[in-house]
């Protein structure tokens, strides 16, 4: 019988903001342990929240093999333990730092109200298996999700400042928010000519589901049957990148580590890969993409973690005139 053991610890801080003021501060700590047992082409899973009894979880996972859930084992070895990142902000300094940020934003953009949340998290994940693998990764990040409301507007909000950062730089945040507000205050007519559109990959998330192996293999994807064909323009490359800053974890939930941390779905316009776990890869004769994720007590499934478009220009200025989509939502999406 073969085993996988995954341990995850996360400390999270959440600062709530309303009317440009810090209104609450919350801290939480989550710890989970997952054990997967493999035998005779089946998987058994056991998970625990909080401190775990590893022997009991192994026994429970072995017992759950009786459910007969088919899943390939295909374990591989390897050792890598990344060092922990530097602390972004000390716990005692989180609220003062964001109060100072909001005070400066209120002074420099006094016609606007800021709200919603700023989150800070530290995560450590370890993976080991009976084939000799032993991995540890750490992630420390700030998530800004600030709504911006024009005081003269009847809207609930008029803009959103969203950003994932790995260090706290107040001046940079203020500069970026003011740049966004300056653009909002300077409406221009939509150009008649065709221009590149610059946006976050999240804006096209519904299209990304067509890369999932189950959709591709079942014939439900727009890409079904087109593996190896050129279906996009020459400059389009889409890849899973598990290197910082795209994701802090170099391995996925199945312990897969891609060469150089990358796996291409589209390379120079050619469709060359799908988002495949070990099970879907075996089912549809596809390469494993290294993008598996799972709940602490669930079967692995494909995720979009680390998915990005490869840069075609060194910075926005090099791309020339373009339409920049900062935020989009609603039924028309």
PLM feature segments, named:
Residues 1-251, 258-261, 267-270:
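Active-site bordering "gate/hinge" segments
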């Amino acid at each position: 019988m073969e085993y996988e053991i995954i341990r995850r610890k996360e400390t999270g801080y959440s600062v709530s903001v309303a009317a440009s003021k810090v209104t609450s501060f919350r801290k939480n700590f989550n710890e989970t342990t997952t054990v997967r047992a493999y035998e005779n082409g089946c998987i058994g899973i056991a998970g625990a929240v909080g401190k775990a009894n590893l022997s009991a979880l192994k026994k429970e996972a072995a017992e759950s093999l009786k459910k007969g859930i088919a899943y390939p084992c295909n374990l591989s070895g390897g050792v890598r333990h990344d060092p922990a990142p530097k602390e972004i902000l000390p716990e005692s300094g989180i609220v003062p730092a964001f109060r100072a940020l909001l005070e400066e934003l209120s002074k420099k953009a006094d016609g606007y109200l800021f709200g919603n949340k700023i989150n800070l998290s530290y995560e450590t994940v370890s993976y080991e298996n009976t084939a000799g693998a032993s991995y540890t990764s750490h992630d420390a990040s700030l998530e800004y999700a600030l709504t911006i409301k024009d005081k003269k507007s009847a809207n609930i909000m008029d803009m959103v400042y969203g950003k994932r950062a790995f260090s706290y730089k107040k001046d940079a945040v203020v500069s970026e928010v003011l740049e966004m507000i300056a653009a909002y205050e300077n409406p221009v007519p939509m150009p008649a000519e065709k221009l590149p559109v610059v946006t976050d990959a999240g804006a096209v998330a519904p299209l990304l589901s067509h890369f999932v192996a189950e959709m591709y293999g079942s014939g439900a994807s727009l890409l079904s049957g087109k593996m190896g064909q050129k279906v996009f323009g020459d400059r389009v490359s889409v890849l899973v990148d598990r290197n910082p800053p795209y994701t802090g974890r170099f391995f996925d939930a199945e312990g897969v580590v891609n060469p150089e941390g990358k796996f291409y779905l589209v390379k120079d316009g050619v469709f060359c890969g799908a988002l495949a776990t070990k099970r879907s890869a075996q089912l549809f004769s596809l390469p494993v993409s290294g993008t598996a994720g799972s709940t602490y007590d669930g079967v692995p499934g494909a995720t979009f973690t680390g998915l990005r478009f490869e840069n075609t220009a060194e910075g926005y200025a090099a791309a020339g005139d373009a339409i920049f989509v900062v935020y989009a939502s609603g039924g028309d999406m």
